[in-house]
């Protein structure tokens, strides 16, 4: 009916124009009449015309009318309805790989698989943390240190709320002036990332008279803008590399972190560095190769086997999220969001994957258990506001292998990209990123399992089957 009404209005309008032309002067514009110059506009009897080219001629065409009503129509595309997997999975407990890495056996302070290790930040709860600006007589700070940190604190808190699905939150205690640390800043000069307990002890002692450290679980130091004393970063954590608790009048500080000059260069930032280091306070592992932090060895994938697809692989991105496996082992991926199957029982299965950062119901990760220490994980990715925009960071599916015999900082998660993919450059100040996201129609096969992305809309629809 809407189409008929619109046609009737246009028909009546055409008749009105036709009859009106009988009394128009010769120079007046008439629909279909000749005009002199393309683009010329003229109004006659409240109807606007524009001169357009029609074949070899130039003619007047109605542009708009002050009296004619315009009817617009829109097409509403219904949201894609979520559909459950076509086969029933195994118990999600079957996908709780038990860690068997040399690193865990030797140190026992960070985990890459089950059971999780506690002792520092709990997997749920609210954590009080402090931002403490610090300067020295020979390295004075600017007038308003919080001006460059307030948005960073919010991004930090929002990120943890997203990846934990609200299970953890942070309360920030801030001091709006620089705390003057005695002596020279050069005493604490640090060229590479690592512990800096002497600096932290001196800074917290200087801050103690001004700041109430009651209940503070971690301190994030903010050095002066533009400083070059701390080139990369300085951090230490309970049970890892903190030599001893740092005393205050209200209780000991067990974790600290300081973002150095490296993070002053955009698009790097403070908040993603704080997130990465806070991940270690939750006892989560580095997914990068820690023995190759400065590119000492040329590698096919420079950062490590998970490239730039996890905050615990590279806080600079491009993808600044947390993989479904790390969410699973810490308790941030609900069991109902996981499809688990043992390889022996795997039949061809179609699964709709809900993008991993969504807060809606649906399977977010499909895991196929290959052995007691190995799993293939499949998850849906979407670019997010936390990310650094890059060609490799796009909508699609990520497939990777988890090896529970490989520990913290040794590459426990390995991407499985489609055949022929390589490294892609980016504007995130990171090395080339492995082009690992599956597009629609792409498939990968590993460890006897084939994963194919068959559709991508609100959800990513995949097919998983035994190879061959």
Question: Where do the model's predicted regions map?
Answer:
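Bacterial N-terminal signal peptides that target proteins for export
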Residues: 1-12
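C-terminal segment of classical bacterial N-terminal signal peptides
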Residues: 19-26
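Secreted, propeptide-processed cysteine-rich mini-domains
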Residues: 28-42
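Extracellular disulfide-bonded cysteine-rich modules/repeats
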Residues: 45-53
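Extracellular mucin-like PTS domains
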Residues: 66-77, 87-88
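Zn2+-dependent metallopeptidase catalytic core
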Residues: 81-267, 274-275, 388, 450, ...
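Non-catalytic C-terminal accessory/binding modules of secreted extracellular proteins
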Residues: 81-85, 97-98, 142, 239-264, ...
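Extracellular hydrolytic enzyme modules, especially secreted metalloproteases
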Residues: 226-388
């Amino acid at each position: 009916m809407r189409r008929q009404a619109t046609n009737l209005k246009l028909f009546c309008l055409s008749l009105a124009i036709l009859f009106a032309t009988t009394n128009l002067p010769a120079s007046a514009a008439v629909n279909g009449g000749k005009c002199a110059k393309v683009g010329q506009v003229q109004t006659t009897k409240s109807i606007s015309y524009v001169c357009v080219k029609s074949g070899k001629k130039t003619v007047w065409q109605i542009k708009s009318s002050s009296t004619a009503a315009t009817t617009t129509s829109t097409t509403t595309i219904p949201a894609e309805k979520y559909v459950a997997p076509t086969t029933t999975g195994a118990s999600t407990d079957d996908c709780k790989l038990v860690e068997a890495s040399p690193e865990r056996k030797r140190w026992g302070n960070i985990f890459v698989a089950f059971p999780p290790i506690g002792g520092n930040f709990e997997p749920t709860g609210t954590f009080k943390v402090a931002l403490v600006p610090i300067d020295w007589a020979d390295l004075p700070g600017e007038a308003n240190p919080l001006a460059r940190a307030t948005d960073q604190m919010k991004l930090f808190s929002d990120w943890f709320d997203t990846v934990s699905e609200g299970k953890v939150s942070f309360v920030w205690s801030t001091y709006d002036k620089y705390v003057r640390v005695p002596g020279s800043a050069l005493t604490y000069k640090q060229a590479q990332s690592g512990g800096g307990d002497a600096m932290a002890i001196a800074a917290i002692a200087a801050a103690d008279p001004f700041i109430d450290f009651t209940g503070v679980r971690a301190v994030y130091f903010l050095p002066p803008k533009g400083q070059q004393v701390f080139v990369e970063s300085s951090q230490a954590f309970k049970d890892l590399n903190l030599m001893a608790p740092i005393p205050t009048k209200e209780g000991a500080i067990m974790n600290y972190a300081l973002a150095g000059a490296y993070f002053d260069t955009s698009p790097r930032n403070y908040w993603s560095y704080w997130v990465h280091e806070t991940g270690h306070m939750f006892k989560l592992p580095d997914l990068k190769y820690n023995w190759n932090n400065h590119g000492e060895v040329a590698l096919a994938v420079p950062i490590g086997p998970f490239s730039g697809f996890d905050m615990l692989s590279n806080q600079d991105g491009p993808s600044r999220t947390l993989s479904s496996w790390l969410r699973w082992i810490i308790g941030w991926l609900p069991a109902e969001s996981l499809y688990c199957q043992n390889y022996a029982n795997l039949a061809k299965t179609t699964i709709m994957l809900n993008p991993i950062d969504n807060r809606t119901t649906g399977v977010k990760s499909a895991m196929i258990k290959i052995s007691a220490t190995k799993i293939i994980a499949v998850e849906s990715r979407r670019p997010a506001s936390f990310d650094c925009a890059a060609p490799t960071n796009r909508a699609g599916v990520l497939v990777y292998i988890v090896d529970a015999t490989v520990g913290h900082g040794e590459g426990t998660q390995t991407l499985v990209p489609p055949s022929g993919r390589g490294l892609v450059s980016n504007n995130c100040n990171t090395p080339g990123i492995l082009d690992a996201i599956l597009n629609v129609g792409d498939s990968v096969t590993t460890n006897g399992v084939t994963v194919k992305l068959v559709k991508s809309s609100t959800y990513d629809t995949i097919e998983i089957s035994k190879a061959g």
